[in-house]
């Protein structure tokens, strides 16, 4: 895990490495338009997406306002679970705090046509999520390189991008694909 026995980082503030986002956009044809990042942090995903899209950033921590406002004028400091913002987005993309992952998935599938979450691969295996995952199956894009969210070496677990599309939401099977490896520099 990211912590490896250490104290948990406040708000699970683990910025998403840009290469993780690049692997996603190389593999998945995401629509343009209005995108929302409901757990935006300081905007690492927004920074990494090279699409020209209209961003809305939502983040609970006030200290993230300034960096987010440099990326989008639509930066809101609030809890995505309690936001009064609309739900007419083309894409919802985030690397949510793991303890809020299911809530983020549910919020995203209501808020956007396409919902994209960077999650531990073992998100597939929970008994608590089994009913949801067997009736609302995502497409799963596995990152073959383990990301480092701390800059101090890689995690000990695998990660994947989980993608739900509103038009295929109620299905029992999704696809799984291992993405291209990122060369070590």
Sequence positions of predicted segments:
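Class I S-adenosyl-L-methionine-dependent methyltransferase catalytic core
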Residues: 1-185
């Amino acid at each position: 895990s990211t912590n490896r026995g250490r104290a948990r980082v406040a708000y699970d503030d683990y910025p998403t490495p840009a290469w993780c986002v690049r692997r996603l956009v190389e593999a998945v044809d995401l629509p343009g338009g209005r995108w929302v990042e409901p757990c935006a942090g300081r905007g690492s995903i927004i920074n990494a997406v090279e699409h020209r899209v209209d961003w809305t950033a939502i983040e609970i921590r006030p200290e993230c306002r300034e960096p987010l406002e440099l990326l989008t004028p639509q930066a809101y400091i609030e809890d995505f679970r309690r936001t009064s913002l609309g739900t007419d987005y083309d894409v919802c993309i985030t690397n949510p705090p793991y303890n809020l992952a299911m809530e983020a998935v549910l919020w995203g599938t209501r808020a956007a046509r396409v919902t994209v979450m960077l999650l531990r691969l073992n998100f597939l295996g929970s008994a608590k999520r089994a009913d949801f995952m067997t009736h609302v199956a995502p497409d799963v894009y596995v990152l073959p390189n383990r990301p480092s969210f701390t800059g101090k070496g890689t995690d000990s677990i695998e990660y994947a991008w989980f993608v739900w599309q509103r038009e295929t939401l109620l299905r029992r099977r999704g696809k799984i694909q291992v993405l291209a490896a990122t060369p070590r520099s």
